[in-house]
Every structure is written in C-alpha cells, then in structure tokens.
Amino acid sequence: MLDGVTRQQCYFDNEIQRVAKNTTLTMDALKHVSKTKDKTVDPLVVAAFYKFVQLNDLASLQDKIESCCRENNVFGIVLLAQEGINSTIAGPREGVVKVLDRIRQDSRFSDLQWKESFATKQPFRKLRVRLKKEIVTLGVPGVDPTELVGTYVKPADWNALISEPDVFVIDTRNNYETEIGTFKGAVDPGLDSFSQLPSWLEKKIDAGKQPRVAMFCTGGIRCEKSTAFLKQVGVKEVYHLQGGILKYLEEVPEEESLWEGECFVFDQRVAVGHGLELADYELCRACRFPLSPLDKQSEYFQEGISCSKCHDQTSIEQKAGFAERQKQFELAKSRKEAFKHAK
C-alpha cells in the first residue's frame, strides 16, 4: 500500500530507482559499452534520476518532457512537483540521451546525474509524465530537501558508518521491499507506505538525545527526504547512503558487502543482487509482493490468484476475478506464441 491506495501506485509515488552507473556527460553515455550477456540483442537503456529543486513552471515542463520522450520512442514515468523531478525512463540509447540532453538544457538540471542499466525488452508499457504534490510522498508540510538534508555517505564509506555501535541504521523502504533484503543490523520500520515513516520516527527518535542516524533506500530519494524531516525536527547528525542501495551493490564487492538478500526494483525485473545482476523473483499478480522460487512452492500459491502473503486477504469473489484475469492472460500469451510461430 502507498498512502492508502494500491501498491501499483508506487510507480507514481515512490522512486523507481533501478540501477547501475552514474553518468555525468552525454559523451560518456554515448561511449558506454554494453555489458548485456546477449550480444545479439541491442539492449534498451534504462535511466533513473531525480533532483530536488524548486520548480514553478510545471505544466510547461510536462509538455516539453512528454513531447521529447514521444519523439524519441522513450517510455517510463516522470514525476514533476514544485520540489523537483523523479523519473525512470527506458528506450534506445540515442533516444534516452536526447531526452536527458533536453532536460539538462534547463539550467536547473544542468548538473543532473542518472543511474543507468540495461534491459533486453521495454520494462515500461506506457509513458506517463505526471504533476504531483511531491515527487516522493512523505505527507509532511514544510519538509524541503532543497534547503536542508543530511550528510551524504559514499558506498565505499557506508560499511564503516553502519558498523559503529552508536549509529541507528534505518531502512526507509516499504515492507514488501525489505522482506527480500536489507543491510545487516538495519531496523525495518514495517512500513506499508513511505508516508508512515514520519510518525514512526517521532516515536523512535528522541531529538533531545541527539542520536546518530543513518538512513538508506533503493536509489537515494526517500532517504534524502527522510533526512530533511529529521533535520527539521532537530536531529543534527543524520546520514544517508549516496546513490542508494543500487549504487552500493554496483560499487562494493560482494565479499565486502554488508547487504543481505536482494534489492526490489520498481519495474518488470522485480529484484537485483550484487553487481546489479538480475535476481530470481517475480511479482504475485494479486498482491504485488515479490516471490522467490521457494515462495512459489507454497501450498497457497496459485499463479495470478494468490500467494502465501495474500491468500487470506482476498475474498472468494476477488479470487474468482483473479482467476478469470489469469485465464485471459494465458490465452493472450498462447495466441501471441501461435502468431509468432506462424510467421
């Protein structure tokens, strides 16, 4: 759940961070050598980026970005709010580079960096450029990451920080994300939505005692906004992982890593591990929780209908609806396969 609505809206309200490599210059992007395992396939580029910056011309920006994406066959999600931009887009490299160039022509985004990964098929079905109240929904008025945030910690320095006994390490992600992986020793608030975090922090963090707090999330946006909240309520020593879990998994060798498990991502890949290798997870179509091969062996797992997480959360009528949807999905898939083999 996210802000009382279905988790499918995470595509609109959470960061959708994906991935691999910060690129600061267009020429760097153009010269990048693909690491895809299938050399017969020209991979699509997936670019994830965000920036907290004051924006007042949202409608104009929306039109410009949407037009540029459509012109260049780029799909994905772009969220715009007065506090900034949050996006993940995917398409041919040339198209993605043109979109990023167009955005960076705006002086407010001239220093925009992005994280880059690859996909052998388009991970997004549509292009959505949306205007929002917040680019990541915390729901607390007055929190402004453009004015005040915590201290960035590079992935190479993260292990040393979170290993210190007086540092309170907090995973700011939702429970369906933390369930498949987190940092060793981190506290999981058990969130259904990011907007629940402020009330949890108010109960657990006593600003008067001036604790040392380290926060992390998938790609950096949620923990950055979380540190802004803690700084606003008076906590002085607040840190957050620069580039998020994904940058850590990319840069820190597995043998040195304090990460345990996999990292949930908000696209059809579902999860990645060390080195940003694809992990063996898929989503339950009923509840959207990530499922491992072991989860799929559960007696409660029915493809497209239920899993061990949701089997007792839906009615008989809902399950019947899911079953019909699954039937239609399989029928459409078989027709597509039949068409493919007939060509």
Predicted regions and their residues:
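Structural scaffold elements adjacent to functional motifs in cytosolic proteins
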Residues: V169-D171
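Glycine-rich active-site/cofactor-binding loop and its immediate structural neighborhood
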Residues: P165
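Rhodanese-like catalytic fold shared by cysteine-dependent sulfurtransferases
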Residues: D28-V149, N174-V213, I221-K343
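A conserved helix-loop-strand patch within extracytoplasmic ligand-binding domains
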Residues: T146, G150-K154, L161-I162
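N-terminal amphipathic/basic-hydrophobic helices that include classical n-h-c signal peptides
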Residues: M1-T26
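Cofactor-cradling patches in redox/metallo enzymes
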Residues: F216
